Amino acid sequence: MRILVTNDDGIDALGIKRLVEALLTLEGAEVSIVAPVEEKSGVGHGITYRSALSPEQRDFYGMPVKAWAVNGNPADCVKAAYHLLFEHGKKPDIVFSGINVGTNLGRDIYYSGTCSGAREAVILGVPGVALSYDNWFDQDNYGDVVEMIRPLVKEFSDRAIKGELASEVFWNINIPHVPLAEVKGMVPATLSMNHYEDKYSEEAEGYYLAREYPQVMPLAEPLDYDLLKHGYIAITPVHIDATDRTLLKQMDNWALLKAWGKQEE
C-alpha cells in the first residue's frame, strides 16, 4: 500500500511525525512524505505556478520512509508528488494530510492548508483524509493522538485499497485534546456553520487577525464543532462539487436568462 503524507504546519512539525508513526504500524505500508519546507497554515487551496518548485529529499527522523521538503503549499506538495515524485504507474493509494495543530471545523475547510492537501488528492483521483487535533493552546502536547488515529488510518487505508471510498469526497477528521480513555466515540458530523468573531489587534508592525470561537451548544444536531467540544472524534465527508443544484434549477425561471435564451450549438 502506497501512502502519501503532507501537512500545512511544515515538514518539521510534530504533528506530521505523529501521523507517520501511526501509519508505519500498518502492515505493508510504503510511506512517502511530501510537505512544505515551512509553515503554510491558512493558505487555502493556493498553488504555485509563477515560481519554481524545488523538492529537496531529506531524512525524516531516521524512519523507513521517503521524504521531500517543498517550497510550496500543501496542494503543491500533493500535485508535485503525484506528477513528479511517484514512479509512473505507482501513484499513491491514499493521501493523509496532518496532523494539524488545532482544529479545522465548519468554514475552516475553506482556509485550511491541511484540508487542501486532502482535497487536492481527490481532485487527482486519490482518496484524501485531513486530520486535525484540538491542541492549539497546547501545541507541543499530542497526548494519545497516535493511539486515537491508528484505527482511523487503518480503516481508511483498507477502504481505499478496496475502492470503497467515494470519489469526489475528502474526509475531514477532528480529534479532541483529551486522554484516549475520555474519547466518547467516533461519529459522522455535519460541518458547523457557526461564525467566528474576527478581531484585529494592532501591533507595532501592523494588524494581526485573532478569532474568537463560537459558544459550544448542546448536541441537538451532529455538528462537528459541538461534537468535538463534547469529546467526540468528528468525521465529515466533504464533497468537492460545490454546485447548488436546487438553485441551478430555479435559475431557469430568471427573466434575464429567459431573455437571452439558450445558446444554439
Swiss-Prot record:
One short Pfam name that applies is SurE
Q: What is this protein called?
A: 5'-nucleotidase SurE
Q: Which reaction does it catalyse?
A: a ribonucleoside 5'-phosphate + H2O = a ribonucleoside + phosphate
Required cofactor names: a divalent metal cation
Q: Name one GO molecular function term.
A: 5'-nucleotidase activity
Q: Which residues bind a divalent metal cation?
A: 8-9, 41, 100
Disulfide pattern: none
Q: Which UniProt keywords apply?
A: Cytoplasm, Hydrolase, Metal-binding, Nucleotide-binding
Any one GO CC term of the record: cytoplasm
